[in-house]
Amino acid sequence: MRGVVGVLALQGDFREHKEALKRLGIEAKEVRKVKDLEGLKALIVPGGESTTIGKLAREYGLEEAVRRRVEEGTLALFGTCAGAIWLAREILGYPEQPRLGVLDAAVERNAFGRQVESFEEDLEVEGLGPFHGVFIRAPVFRRLGEGVEVLARLGDLPVLVRQGKVLASSFHPELTEDPRLHRYFLELAGV
């Protein structure tokens, strides 16, 4: 094993991210408490229900601990779907929803519709090429700060963005067999 990556395991599809990391030869550590962050250089925040993830992270003290590590530059983050919502500075229409706020972006929850309107679409990811995106009640990035780079779009809408060591995706790369986006994050994190 080359390294260990944390996967926030409070709610959502954290098991799928663990499997994606395993296929790359990376050990995944479930993170549920602040002490679970010790020694980690990278953390994946999975899809699921963004309000629940935010409330539980706040209740368990993870919100402040993760924010501090990201601001210090000692922790890289990858948020997918609900995880991307939690990373954003602003959640449109939900000003009171708990959020980490480390990604200078405003996101719109469920921007493509409800669960029954979920879909799959081929995307062009900068530096990676074609990538199959699975969109389930997916958010979209409506406003991006100057330091945020768009890596993929669906039409005109940004669906994969990066700011420093923070990567955020509207779609679910863990639900495909394609390891490239997880590998990209590992390289970004130096794992």
Curated annotation (Swiss-Prot):
A GO molecular function held by the record: pyridoxal 5'-phosphate synthase (glutamine hydrolysing) activity
InterPro entries assigned: Class_I_gatase-like, PdxT/SNO, PdxT/SNO_CS
Chain sites annotated for binding L-glutamine: G48, E49, S50, R109, I136, R137
One of the GO BP terms on file: pyridoxine metabolic process
Enzyme Commission number(s) from the entry: 4.3.3.6, 3.5.1.2
Pathway note: Cofactor biosynthesis; pyridoxal 5'-phosphate biosynthesis
Keyword Cytoplasm: no
Cellular component, GO, one term: glutaminase complex
Protein name stated in the entry: Pyridoxal 5'-phosphate synthase subunit PdxT
Natural source organism: Thermus thermophilus (strain ATCC BAA-163 / DSM 7039 / HB27)
